[in-house]
C-alpha cells in the first residue's frame, strides 16, 4: 500500500526517515517535500498530484495541507493521518493575530538569515521535549532558503489558510488524528476534530511525546501507521 508522508514547517522529506526505516516493505512509504511558490489550495493539490492514490500522513503544516487535499480530492486520499495538525483557525480575530505573528517571523527571517531563524524556531516551548539530535537541524538548513520559509509563513500558515472546521463532517474515513500527550493544545484539537467528523473517529495519543511526535517517537508513529494499513487491508 502506498503511503505519502508530508513534513511540517522548516522540515524536509528527510524528517520522515526514522519513521520510514521502521515500516515494513509492503508499505510503499514516500516522503515528499512541500512544494513552494504556490497558494495553499494549489500546494495541497500539487502534493496529491505527486503522491497519487494513497494514505496521506501529514505533520503540522503538512497535516493541514493533507486535510485540504482529502476534502478537495477524496478520490486520491485513501486514508488520512494528521499528526499535531488542525483544520486552521476558526475565529477571525485569532486568525488575523496569527497572520500578524507569522509576518513578524517572516521579517525576522529576512533580517537575520536562515541559521538564526531556525535556531530560534527550535528553541520555542513547543519543541521543549524534542531532543536536539532528533531535530534534524542540518537537514532543515540544507533544505530551506529564506524565500521558502517566508513563503510558508505568509501563504501556508494557519493564519493565511481558509479554516476547514465546517467541512470536517464531509471528510470521508478512515481518518486518524494523532497528538502527543505532552502537547495539550493538540490533544484537545484532536478530540474536537474527531467529534466533528463522526463517532467512528478515535484520536490516538502518543505517550510521553510533545508536538513533533514523529521525531520524538518514530517507533510509536510507525506502529500506528502499520495499524492503519492493517485496518485498511484486513
Annotated model-derived regions:
Residues 56-58, 83:
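Short beta-strand immediately N-terminal to the catalytic nucleophile in serine-hydrolase-like folds
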Residues 58-62, 66:
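Gly/Ala-rich beta-loop-alpha elbow adjacent to hydrolase catalytic centers
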Residues 1-38:
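Conserved HGGG/HGGXW glycine-rich cap/lid loop of the alpha/beta-hydrolase fold
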Residues 209-218, 222:
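Catalytic histidine-centered segment of alpha/beta-hydrolase-like enzymes
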Residues 142-195, 205:
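Conserved serine/cysteine hydrolase catalytic core
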Residues 195-211:
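Catalytic histidine neighborhood in serine/cysteine hydrolases
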Residues 71, 78-110:
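Flexible "cap/lid" loop of the alpha/beta hydrolase fold
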Residues 93, 108-167:
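Conserved alpha/beta-hydrolase catalytic His-Asp/Glu region
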Amino acid at each position: 500500500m502506498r503511503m505519502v508522508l508530508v513534513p511540517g514547517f522548516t522540515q524536509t522529506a528527510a524528517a520522515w526517515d526514522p519513521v520510514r526505516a521502521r515500516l515494513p516493505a509492503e508499505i510503499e512509504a514516500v516522503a515528499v517535500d512541500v512544494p513552494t511558490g504556490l497558494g495553499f489550495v494549489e500546494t495541497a493539490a500539487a502534493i496529491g498530484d505527486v503522491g497519487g492514490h494513497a494514505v496521506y500522513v501529514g505533520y503540522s503544516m503538512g497535516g493541514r495541507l493533507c486535510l485540504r487535499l482529502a476534502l478537495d480530492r477524496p478520490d486520491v486520499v485513501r486514508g488520512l493521518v494528521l499528526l499535531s495538525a488542525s483544520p486552521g483557525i476558526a475565529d477571525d480575530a485569532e486568525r488575523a493575530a496569527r497572520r500578524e505573528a507569522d509576518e513578524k517571523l517572516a521579517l525576522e527571517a529576512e533580517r537575520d538569515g536562515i541559521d538564526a531563524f531556525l535556531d530560534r524556531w527550535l528553541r520555542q516551548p513547543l519543541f521543549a521535549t524534542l531532543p536536539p539530535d532528533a531535530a534534524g537541524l542540518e537537514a532543515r538548513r540544507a533544505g530551506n532558503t529564506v524565500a521558502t520559509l517566508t513563503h510558508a509563513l505568509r501563504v501556508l500558515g494557519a493564519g493565511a489558510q481558509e479554516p476547514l472546521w465546517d467541512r470536517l463532517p464531509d471528510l470521508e474515513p478512515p481518518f486518524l488524528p494523532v497528538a502527543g500527550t505532552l502537547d495539550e493544545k493538540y490533544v484537545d484539537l484532536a478530540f474536537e476534530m474527531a467529534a466533528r467528523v463522526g463517532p467512528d473517529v478515535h484520536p490516538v495519543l502518543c505517550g510521553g511525546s510533545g508536538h513533533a511526535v514523529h521525531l520524538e517517537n518514530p517507533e510509536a508513529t510507525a506502529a500506528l501507521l502499520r495499524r492503519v494499513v492493517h485496518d485498511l487491508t484486513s
